[in-house]
């Protein structure tokens, strides 16, 4: 069974009318001074719990008539079908050119190598990437997609010359929980690759130490991600502006603490 040419034209016209009605509904709602309605957002567990949750609570306190719903998940949901306004997600360079997505960067996401002083005293500080490959590394298998990903293959960029290298790491411990990997690292079980927003307090206190500090993972920054719509509600636009301003100074980014001097590992 298939539509006639006239039927296809009618369906396309109907789709256009629905978009216009949705835009008109949003425009009428925006004329209200006070924000109301519901904003529904998805985010990853780590950033959602540690940083996004408090920011959303602060925004809602400024707009008491507004409802905010935060869904924490490790898989990016189908935002349009499941009724989300958008998601706060790590969005890599490869994703940014997708025409059916609307994105805005919320914060920079720098991922660095770190270990505990106890581990470095026991195993030594790796002098270069080949030496890193001989160490116990803690692998986080987070945010997996439909396609399998080699989580033990780390891509690292040199801060000075911008060169990148891929290194396959080894280690006996891996988890789909970033918090678990961080706990293992604090317990002296190996070297991990984590976001600064996740471990800045431990770096500042000296519980963790940067390893190979001139290297970091190429950035997949934290973005507002949403499917394209004819018009974005005012409550959503103001929330995005609020989050950009809240994280503009990267509140987790602290001055690097004085580093202990563990012995260097032999190459």
Residue ranges of model-derived segments:
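Short secondary-structure boundary segments
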Residues: 91, 117, 196-197, 215
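Short, well-ordered beta-strand segments
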Residues: 40-42, 87, 138, 192, ...
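Central regulatory/effector-binding core of bacterial HTH transcription factors
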Residues: 36-99, 257-267
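Hydrophobic residues within well-ordered alpha-helices
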Residues: 4-7, 79, 132, 183-188, ...
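Hydrophobic hinge/microswitch elements
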Residues: 163-210, 216-218, 224, 240
């Amino acid at each position: 069974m298939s539509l006639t040419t006239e039927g296809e034209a009618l369906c396309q016209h109907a789709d256009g009318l629905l978009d216009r009605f949705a835009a008109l509904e949003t425009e009428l709602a925006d004329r209200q001074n006070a924000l109301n309605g519901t904003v529904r957002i998805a985010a990853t567990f780590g950033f959602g719990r540690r940083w996004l949750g408090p920011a959303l609570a602060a925004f809602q306190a400024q707009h008491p008539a507004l409802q905010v719903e935060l869904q924490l998940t490790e898989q990016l949901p189908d935002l349009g079908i499941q009724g989300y306004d958008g998601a706060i997600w790590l969005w890599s360079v490869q994703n940014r050119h997708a025409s059916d997505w609307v994105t805005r960067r919320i914060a920079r996401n720098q991922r660095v190598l770190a270990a505990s002083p106890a581990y470095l005293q026991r195993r030594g500080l790796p002098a270069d990437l080949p030496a890193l490959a001989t160490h116990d590394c803690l692998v986080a298998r987070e945010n997996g997609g439909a396609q399998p990903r080699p989580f033990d293959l780390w891509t690292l960029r040199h801060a000075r010359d911008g060169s990148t290298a891929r290194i396959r790491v080894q280690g006996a411990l891996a988890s789909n929980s970033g918090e678990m990997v961080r706990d293992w690292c604090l317990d002296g079980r190996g070297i991990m690759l984590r976001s600064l927003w996740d471990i800045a307090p431990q770096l500042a206190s000296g519980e963790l130490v940067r390893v190979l500090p001139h290297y970091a993972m190429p950035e997949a920054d934290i973005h507002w991600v949403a499917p394209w719509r004819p018009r974005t509600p005012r409550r959503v636009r103001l929330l995005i502006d609020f989050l950009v301003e809240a994280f503009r100074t990267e509140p987790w980014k602290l001055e690097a603490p004085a580093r202990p001097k563990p012995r260097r590992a032999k190459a």
